[in-house]
A protein has these predicted regions:
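Glycine-rich phosphate-binding loops of nucleotide-dependent enzymes
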Residues: 1-233
Length: 233
């Protein structure tokens, strides 16, 4: 479904990504792991069209989308749930959700909204409440719901556990698993190594803009290099 080949990216003269290769098959959960500054968010931005790679290519559903504008990539079915959630705090929950379906017809919007409220009954209860008054966990639900309103094929989660309590982190990862079981392909970009490897089918580890480890998640969980670098073991 997604094939990334030899992606290089830079901010001015500062190289951030140096030859990233990765792929996702339909129905998978694939994790991209790394510490702050490793290049994870830059990779996301290059996949979603916010930045154009200096070199390399991005293919999605068999089409080369390198350099496409973000809205065209969203129309193709790839959508990002951004770090920090990026809701409109002075709009209601319902208005924020509807932002995700502005390109959809009325029938599609209604159907997708029913689906979101089925997954997140709490959002239905708070649909008229201002998004800025929600708790951190509820805001993350709203950000995910907004993305589901676009009827995506691939969801890219950028640090979904950031700023959440341990209990809410558990709930968030369970929610991602539930969405995947409904057939959604997921790219999970995270610092939470243990939870991510428990959830994912495969994983890539990025350090200083390059992939240093990759493979099946259960195998990587036992890798001594990863344990030393990220778990202090």
């Amino acid at each position: 479904m997604l094939e990334v080949k030899n992606i290089h990216a830079a901010y001015g003269k500062v190289n951030v990504l140096r030859g990233i290769d990765l792929h996702l098959e339909e129905g998978e959960i694939v994790a991209v792991l790394g510490s702050n500054g490793a290049g994870k968010t830059t990779l996301n931005h290059n996949l979603c069209g916010l930045y154009c790679p200096v070199e390399g290519s991005v293919k999605f559903s068999g089409m080369d989308i390198t350099g496409w504008r973000p809205e065209k990539i969203v129309e193709m079915g790839m959508i990002q749930i951004p770090e920090g959630r990026r809701l409109f705090p002075n709009l209601s929950v319902l208005e924020n959700l509807e932002m995700g379906s502005y390109k959809r017809g009325k029938a599609s919007r209604i159907q997708n909204l029913e689906r979101v409220f089925q997954i997140f009954p709490r959002l239905k209860e708070r649909r008229e409440q201002l998004a800025g008054t929600l708790s951190g966990g509820e805001q993350q639900m709203a950000a995910i719901g907004r993305s589901l309103m676009a009827d995506p094929k691939l969801m890219i989660f950028d640090e979904p556990s950031l700023g959440l309590s341990p209990i809410l982190v558990e709930e968030m990862f369970q929610l991602i698993a539930d969405i995947n079981r409904q057939g959604m392909t997921i790219l999970l970009v995270e610092q939470n190594v243990v939870q991510s490897l428990n959830l994912a089918n495969r994983a890539y580890v990025i350090e200083n803009g390059t992939v240093t480890l990759s493979g099946k998640a259960n195998k990587l969980a036992e890798n001594p290099e990863l344990k030393k670098s990220f778990l202090g073991l």
